[in-house]
Amino acid sequence: VIMDGAVKEAKRLNVEIVGGHTEFSDCVVRPIVSGTAIGKVKRVLKKTDLQPGDRLFVTKSLALEGTCILADIVKPALTEEEKRTLERFNSSLSVSRESVALSKLDSVSAMHDVTEGGVLGAAAEICFSVGLGANLYESKMPVAELTARLCESNGVDPLRLISSGSMLAAVRGDDTEAKAAMKALGVEFTEIGEVTDDTVVTLIKTNGTTENVDVLPDELYKFSGESK
């Protein structure tokens, strides 16, 4: 099943699987997959190109993967529409289309996929790695209704929840091309903040208070003993 999925995705991306290795161990109770991708690119985006004043955008809505995992753990009662929403989330976890499109634009200075630790963790990682900071705005964060409901009912912060499927992109200057490229793909593209010249990532909350953001464990670790 794992390799069937890998082969299907490789064909979709027009890439070749050239080798592999499998083994069994009593120490490992679940399948673990790791991979290495090798290829050529015309332009390399580096975190060191990030500069104060760059604006931060995210694609799609946040915590897509986290919502799917959380639903699998807590088994909430879902309407048929919510079940279809989960299926749509699950099929939207790749960022290949938007990352390829954005990487071609001179206005995009850096990108970082939003995985463990959510969007706050991703912003902290990319900024701290180059000695910069950021202002992030809670009111601008794109969180789907189902995600918000499941997170609220289970004491989870969606901004710190694994968000595979979202790409964090820094845009310098005119954002017209970037917005047009994402619109052409049918991908939401939301501005959530800007890079600053200090070393603090600040979340400006909807109630007017602020919070200094650090790289912390993902919210799913709250359920580490329940995910079987």
What are these regions (language model features)?
Residues 87-163:
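Active-site-proximal betaalpha loop/short-helix elements
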Residues 10, 25-30, 47-51, 76-79, ...:
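Solvent-exposed alpha-helices and their adjacent loops that cap or buttress functional pockets
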Residues 1-73, 194:
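Glycine-rich anion-binding loops of enzyme active sites
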Residues 183-228:
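Acidic, Ser/Thr/Pro-rich beta/coil linker or hinge segments at domain junctions
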Residues 34-45, 81-103:
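Active-site glycine-rich loop that binds ribose-phosphate moieties when present
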